[in-house]
Amino acid sequence: MIETLLQSPSSWTNFFIFFGLAVLLLFAVLGFVTYGILAERKVMGFMQGRIGPNQVGGRFGLLQTVADVLKLLLKEDSIPKAADKPLFILAPVIAFAPAFMVLAVIPFTDKFQFADIGVGLLYYIAVSGITTIGVVTGGWASNNKYSLLGGMRAAAQMISYEIPLVMSVIGIVLLAGSLNLNEIVAAQENVWYIFVQPIGFVVFLIAAVAELNRTPFDLPEAESELVSGYHTEYSGFRWAFFMLSEYVYFFGMASLITVLFLGGWNPVMFLGFIPGAVWFALKFSSVVFLLIWFRVTFPRIRGDQLMEFGWKVLLPIALANIFLTALIKELFF
């Protein structure tokens, strides 16, 4: 359906159809964010020997996150007197908009994707980097030392881990011969790339956690060091925009890992009768659980350790993986 619309002449009808689909995707993502946060809190509670949310919405706390959102909407929206007001207001939007834009190229099934472009993987990596501009802008515009330090940490972390992230997927591009995410999924019909590219998967997973600013790489918003990091001065809905962008990227990165390394919607052998959307959801949920598990398990590392690990460990391993993949492809394929 979407491919037919893309190839049809421009019209207001097509515009409103695309707008409606975009709104549906936005609500689907917001639903994931709402209950993804709840699931994270419940899993963390279980792993730490606690119950987790259990008051609002029954014994499982099903409406706890909804109540939190309503609370944020009702909070005062304050702007510090010394802040750069235009940039302070604009920063959350700059941080959130790219997070939603990258979802356009993710193929959730073979029939559901907003933009099937030839350089989908490159588009995702390029657009996702814009969010750091919003983070740094918010930190600087707040005119707060903690916020500025958080923004600078975010910039340094993004530079350090964006390179290994990109390098780790070059092996996949070499094997699939394309930057198109649909073609990468199709190339995994017989064997998933997690088995062909285990080194690339490990490097990508670690770099992805760093890009998401999640534990153990959550230095830009380290509560015990920087109060709340780059969004210390934000409150209410503007603060919610920063949190929303973080969890939308969580959704996007888990989807991208599913597409690149877990075969997307391709089924396990002899279970092809199960719909592709179900397979995608199962793989996606496994990645989300793994990332939550990381948050509970690992302590935060120091800034110097973060930089050294990115430049001295991940980058050389990613480069070695490229040469190894090119050699194997040249000799055996």
UniProtKB/Swiss-Prot annotation:
Compartments where found: Cell membrane
Signal sequence extent: none
GO MF term (any one): NADH dehydrogenase activity
Spans through the membrane: 15-35, 88-108, 117-137, 159-179, 191-211, 239-259, 274-296, 313-333
Protein's organism: Bacillus anthracis
Reactions catalysed, as given in the entry: a quinone + NADH + 5 H(+)(in) = a quinol + NAD(+) + 4 H(+)(out)
Protein name, per record: NADH-quinone oxidoreductase subunit H
GO biological process: aerobic respiration
Entry similarity comment: Belongs to the complex I subunit 1 family.
Cited HAMAP family: NDH1_NuoH
EC number: 7.1.1.-
